[in-house]
């Protein structure tokens, strides 16, 4: 019988079973062979014939404690090997109940069995919640557009019952963020530049175009509005940023400001910090007109940079004096020889008041002057009064004035 039992054990070791973990240690194996053959009648015949190595596991009444201690010692030293075997070799369906019923109250759960159960329990919610938030989840990954199948949407409470169950199981792995691609971020930023708030049809359209869900687009716009609000309050509080001399610096401002009919509206919107005062008036026509005026501003700024190089040199000597206000009398009193030439070039519009006959070269020559004297906090009274009063500009003057406003820092103006 002993020889036959050894042959059976060798056969069972060649296939995955629960008994391999119990009989793979030689010291434990020899202790089984003396005691378990006598008491092998405890196991019912079907289990004994199909799985013969269960009889030493379950019927060894006098030696369960020594076996458990040796098994625990060996599993501590060979923990990785035991854990890998337990993970790779699932037990047959009829085997675990037989071990539990036969061993019964005399033997507790083995350590590797506990590890297997806990890893199963934690891997199921972890894998499903991790799979619910891929790096770029397609729109078909969630069961419905309104269900919260995404772990990245971290603002609102889940509306799906299965997701709520997953959150209860794996609460530590839920707060994952969606990684947007550069293309998606660019399109979302463009849309946010023109519309701070999206209606639902537009949100569905953007989600379909960018391969996102409607919930992800909504949450991104909520976060972006909060970021815009923080940026606006920070700029109003500090007021010392010189980084908006180019047209790209006006990205956080409202999309409807550049297309407003009066020139004082962009100044008031940026000066008072009311970031949501004119959000309802942004429509596609005004957005297109704002993009046209932005392109016009960029081209005008480039022309001003080409034409105004000698003018910057001329004004660098007089920038400390009051000639930076573009008054002709104080400029001619200064000892600089190039200052009258400079003021002759900028003569048609000394203070940007209501002059209809201003030409584009004179305006582009005045662009570097504006960027230089905008660093001083004082302005001429005529310019300030003309800014406060809404004036009916022609279309040409309005384009010129909009492009000029896009090149100076509006935070230094006193209202």
Curated annotation (Swiss-Prot):
DNA-binding region boundaries: 173-232
SUPFAM superfamilies recorded: Homeodomain-like (SSF46689)
GO cellular component, one term: nucleus
Gene3D superfamilies according to UniProt: Homeodomain-like (1.10.10.60)
Coiled-coil intervals, chain numbering: none
Family statement drawn from the similarity comment of this UniProt entry: Belongs to the Antp homeobox family. Proboscipedia subfamily.
Function: Sequence-specific transcription factor which is part of a developmental regulatory system that provides cells with specific positional identities on the anterior-posterior axis.
Annotated protein name in UniProt: Homeobox protein Hox-B2a
Organism: Takifugu rubripes (Japanese pufferfish)
Chain's gene name: hoxb2a
């Amino acid at each position: 019988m002993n020889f036959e039992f050894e042959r059976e054990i060798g056969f069972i070791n060649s296939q995955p079973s629960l008994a391999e973990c119990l009989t793979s240690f030689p010291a434990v194996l020899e202790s089984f062979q003396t005691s378990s053959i006598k008491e092998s009648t405890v196991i019912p015949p079907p289990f004994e014939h199909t799985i013969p190595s269960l009889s030493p596991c379950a019927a060894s009444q006098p030696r369960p404690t020594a076996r458990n201690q040796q098994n625990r010692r060996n599993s501590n030293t060979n923990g990785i090997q035991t854990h890998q075997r337990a993970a790779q070799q699932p037990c047959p369906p009829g085997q675990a109940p037989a071990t539990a019923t036969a061993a019964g109250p005399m033997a507790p759960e083995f350590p590797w069995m506990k590890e297997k159960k806990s890893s199963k329990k934690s891997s199921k919610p972890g894998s499903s919640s991790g799979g619910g938030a891929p790096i770029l989840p397609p729109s078909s990954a969630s069961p419905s557009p309104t269900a919260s199948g995404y772990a990245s949407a971290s603002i609102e409470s889940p509306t799906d019952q299965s997701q709520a169950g997953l959150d209860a199981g794996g609460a530590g792995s839920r707060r994952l963020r969606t990684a947007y691609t550069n293309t998606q971020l660019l399109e979302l930023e463009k849309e946010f530049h023109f519309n701070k708030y999206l209606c639902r049809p537009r949100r569905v359209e953007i989600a379909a175009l960018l391969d996102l869900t409607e919930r992800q687009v909504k949450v991104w716009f909520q976060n972006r509005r909060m970021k815009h609000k923080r940026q606006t309050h920070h700029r109003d509080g500090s007021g010392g940023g010189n980084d908006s001399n180019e047209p790209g610096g006006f990205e956080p401002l409202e999309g409807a400001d550049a297309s407003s009919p009066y020139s004082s509206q962009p100044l008031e919107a940026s000066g008072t910090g009311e970031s949501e005062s004119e959000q309802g008036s942004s429509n596609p026509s005004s957005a297109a007109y704002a993009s046209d005026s932005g392109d016009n501003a960029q081209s005008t700024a480039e022309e001003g940079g080409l034409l105004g190089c000698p003018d910057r040199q001329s004004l660098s000597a007089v920038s400390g004096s009051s000639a930076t206000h573009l008054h002709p009398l104080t400029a001619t009193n200064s000892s600089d020889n190039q200052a009258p030439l400079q003021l002759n070039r900028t003569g048609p519009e000394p203070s940007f008041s209501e002059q209809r006959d201003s030409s584009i070269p004179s305006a582009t020559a005045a662009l570097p002057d504006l960027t230089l004297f905008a660093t001083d906090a004082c302005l001429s009274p005529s310019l300030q009064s003309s800014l406060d009063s809404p004036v009916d500009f022609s279309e040409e003057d309005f384009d010129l004035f909009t492009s000029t406003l896009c090149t100076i820092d509006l935070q230094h103006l006193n209202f």
